């Protein structure tokens, strides 16, 4: 059954002002309804190998016959990428975050590990659809910290889940409704950590064009650009 929605996409990545290597990666297959970012976190400059492994394993993804089958397929591919990273001998144990959005008919399938994020703009209101996997967020969930306190902690950067890092890969997933007029942002932390939520919301609310993501990246660069910056904007009609 074909999707009742049409999507339009713009995407981009930038090395930022301080990194020597862009360890971010992105993948877009609009025909199959898949959008993904990965933020390499490996030591010794090997994070780019991990994020590239994720892209390599999802490149041949084809939409399945149901939400469950689509979720199972992308999960399997990410587990294969996880094993590829684990098998990289002498590569400094490279790892990567991942955040993927699949639009299947009238559903949005979200799957992620780490602190790359998926936002949705609907009716002018921006909502974060994913939850970061880091030590600070764990303490916030346990009630030990306020959200503001968690964001200030250095442990906000210490990931508890990622592709390739731990023995087992633990992914979070969610399924939500898609409506015409929705706009999604899939991005790495180099984008959202530089921009206040209100700024992301206002910039995403502009008329859709290929320049929306470019403008977000330029704004992040002007505010510091301390990390690699990668994002994808998906407009649903």
Please report, for each region that a protein language model flagged, where it lies by residue:
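PP2C/PPM-type serine/threonine phosphatase catalytic domain
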Residues: 1-237
